[in-house]
């Protein structure tokens, strides 16, 4: 017997993995095929199967994919989870509330989940019962389990939640049908989380404006038809096209028109046409302690971790419900208890010495690589990382770390001891002390940590090698990190070194003004032009583009032959912005390096910004490895780190 997150009946062959999966970027919403090339289920279809996963992870847009699968007839027949998850169930809840479509979701104990993963067939009951067998039932048996969702009454929704008079009025329809349905969805999520009350939010960032299929547009247009109106200041995430230039960029009307219509619908509901996946770069960025309702995984992680604002990782559609009501469930990272670290990560002495010894050679590829690794280790636990107290990352470093962390973790918050605002010390991050001096180095003793329900993991150089190699296209899933590491602890050479590059993809998350300045300086100092076979494309928000243009950064970038694209991001861009002839893409984004192969069917390489510029001028991927992974700091084979110098070959880097 499990806990029914969405009650219902369903059965089918079990498709199982012990690794979480982001439905967006991980499953094709048109046919249900797993497309995340790093996932063990890659290439298999979830349609009609009982899908067993620990949880979802990564993108808030997973709820959109669930709804697309439901309405398109390609959804699983049921879902079995072993950990908490709100993104996947939210897609089903919206399907029930607006479209009368559903599938059962049950959370199992770890032991029962392991049993389910080893079974051939599962039958889910509306009471949360799960019957497992080693024999696969016939299609007719599975079809007989399909069910029509039973509507939860308003009284049942309000029964265990403290509601204000205006909440009850909204639930009763006093503020219109859009707000009424939004309140029902909010209360269903609150009940799912065991929440007893709602709280006010000061602002919302909507991730659900990304067009991945007709279901998302139907949702937004229904809110408009009900004359919905957002109650709090609301910004919009990057949409699926450059709203002002998609025709000029050669995008087909098949995508351009519905994607634009979706963005327009949210603007009509009262949102600002910000169209950026980095809302923390806007003047409206929240302050520490401010309760907000944000979607977009990288933005949520950055707001919680680096700004000290408070938000759960709100699924697409739920973000709009919060904007319509100004209310959110009082749970997760909104509460002190949900922000305390429950995993301590330490750098082993070798890795710490290498990182600290790198000094100025600790380039901008380090932070997304580390974020990717920390997210993998953290999964659903809030982590605190120690060992970097003497390092001072920039805002862009933390942006890259947050995006990478949000790609591999399901949790919405991390702490870096001595760096992020709620972790001046390790003990503070664990909730053991307050008021400590910022950047104080605190080695909480093992006995103290041992009294808490806190796991501890040591990160090794080999772990970082594995993460970098995966991002850089070296590892297919069977190749070990040890095989990539030489006896001295550095990355070995690779057949990928010097590989031809046809596209340089920058701006995931959206470029900042400071990144525009760095790129402009690099390109202006280059003695070589852009390679004729390479496209350089940067995505960024409208506000950033305007400020960068005002400061004079845009001219050298455009003079180099780069294309600046606003309103959308690499998570949504396809052909023709991705050239049809491009076979290999290089990026400085760990998020895009992870999702890109599944999204656009190209091979991805990973480098820092300097390495990406080198690829744009040479048409080849950089050779060697970052100095912080080289077998000795200052190795002559260490690649593209440090500052630029003019040489006969044009833009090069020196340590």
Residue ranges and their predicted role:
Residues 57-60, 84-87, 205-212, 236-239, ...:
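Gly/Ser/Thr-rich loops at beta-strand to alpha-helix junctions
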Residues 90-110, 121-123, 229, 236-326:
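A generic, well-ordered mixed alpha/beta core segment in the N-terminal half of proteins
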Residues 250-258, 429-456, 547-567:
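Acidic, Ser/Thr-rich peripheral helices and adjacent loops at domain boundaries
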Residues 60, 64-78, 82, 93, ...:
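Glycine-rich, N-terminal phosphate-binding loop and its surrounding beta-alpha-beta segment
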């Amino acid at each position: 017997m499990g806990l029914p997150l969405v009650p219902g009946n369903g059965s089918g062959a079990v498709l199982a993995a012990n690794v979480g999966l982001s439905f967006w970027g991980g499953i094709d919403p048109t046919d249900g095929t797993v497309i995340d090339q790093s996932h063990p289920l890659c290439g298999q279809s979830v349609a009609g199967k009982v899908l067993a996963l620990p949880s979802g992870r990564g993108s808030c847009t997973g709820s959109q994919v669930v709804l697309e699968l439901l309405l398109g007839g390609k959804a699983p027949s049921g879902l079995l989870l072993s950990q908490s998850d709100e993104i996947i169930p939210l897609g089903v809840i919206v399907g029930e509330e607006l479209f009368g479509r559903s599938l059962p979701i049950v959370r199992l104990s770890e032991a029962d989940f392991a049993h389910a993963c080893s079974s051939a067939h599962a039958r889910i009951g509306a009471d949360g019962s799960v019957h497992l067998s080693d024999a696969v039932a016939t299609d007719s048996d599975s079809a007989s389990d399909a069910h029509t969702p039973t509507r939860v009454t308003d009284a049942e929704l309000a029964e265990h939640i403290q509601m204000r008079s205006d909440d009850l009025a909204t639930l009763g329809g006093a503020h219109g049908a859009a707000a009424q349905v939004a309140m029902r969805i909010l209360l269903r999520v609150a009940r799912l989380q065991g929440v007893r009350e709602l709280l006010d939010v000061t602002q919302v960032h909507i991730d659900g404006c990304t067009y991945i299929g007709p279901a998302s547009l139907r949702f937004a247009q229904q809110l408009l038809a009900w004359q919905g109106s957002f109650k709090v200041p609301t910004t919009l995430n990057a949409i699926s096209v450059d709203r002002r230039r998609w025709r000029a960029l050669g995008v087909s009307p098949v995508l351009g028109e519905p994607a634009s219509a979706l963005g327009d619908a949210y603007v009509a509901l009262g949102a600002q046409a910000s169209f950026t996946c980095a809302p923390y770069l806007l003047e409206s960025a929240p302050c520490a302690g401010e309760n907000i309702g944000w979607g977009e995984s990288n933005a949520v992680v950055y707001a919680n971790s680096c700004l000290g604002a408070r938000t759960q990782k709100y699924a697409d559609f739920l973000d709009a419900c919060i904007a319509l009501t100004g209310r959110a469930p009082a749970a997760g990272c909104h509460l002190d208890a949900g922000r305390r670290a429950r995993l301590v990560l330490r750098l082993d002495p070798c890795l710490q010495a290498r990182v600290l010894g790198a000094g100025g050679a600790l380039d901008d590829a380090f932070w997304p690589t580390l974020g990717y690794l920390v997210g993998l280790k953290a999964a659903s636990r809030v982590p605190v990382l120690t060992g970097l107290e003497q390092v001072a990352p920039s805002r862009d470093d933390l942006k890259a770390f947050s995006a990478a962390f949000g790609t591999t973790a399901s949790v919405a918050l991390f702490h870096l001891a001595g760096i992020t605002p709620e972790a001046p010390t390790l003990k503070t991050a664990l909730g053991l002390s307050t008021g400590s001096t910022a950047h104080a180095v605190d080695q909480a003793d093992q006995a103290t940590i041992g009294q808490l329900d806190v796991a501890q993991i040591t990160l090794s150089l080999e772990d970082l090698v594995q993460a970098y190699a995966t991002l850089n296209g070296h590892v297919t899933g069977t190749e070990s990190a040890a095989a990539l590491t030489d006896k001295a602890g550095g990355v070995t050479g690779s057949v990928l070194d010097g590989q031809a590059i046809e596209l340089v993809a920058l701006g995931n998350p959206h470029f900042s003004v400071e990144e525009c300045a760095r790129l402009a300086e690099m390109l202006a100092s280059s003695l070589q032009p852009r390679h004729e076979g390479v496209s350089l494309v940067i995505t960024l928000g409208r506000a950033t583009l305007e400020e960068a243009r005002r400061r004079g950064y845009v001219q050298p970038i455009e003079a180099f032959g780069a294309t600046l694209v606003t309103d959308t991001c690499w998570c949504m861009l396809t052909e023709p912005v991705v050239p049809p002839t491009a076979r290999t893409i290089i990026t400085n984004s760990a998020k895009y390096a992870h999702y890109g192969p599944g999204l656009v069917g190209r091979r991805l390489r990973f480098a820092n910004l300097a390495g990406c510029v080198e690829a744009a001028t040479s048409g080849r991927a950089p050779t060697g490895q970052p100095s912080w992974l080289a077998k000795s700091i200052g190795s002559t084979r260490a690649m593209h780190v440090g500052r630029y110098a003019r040489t006969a070959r044009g833009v090069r880097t020196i340590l």
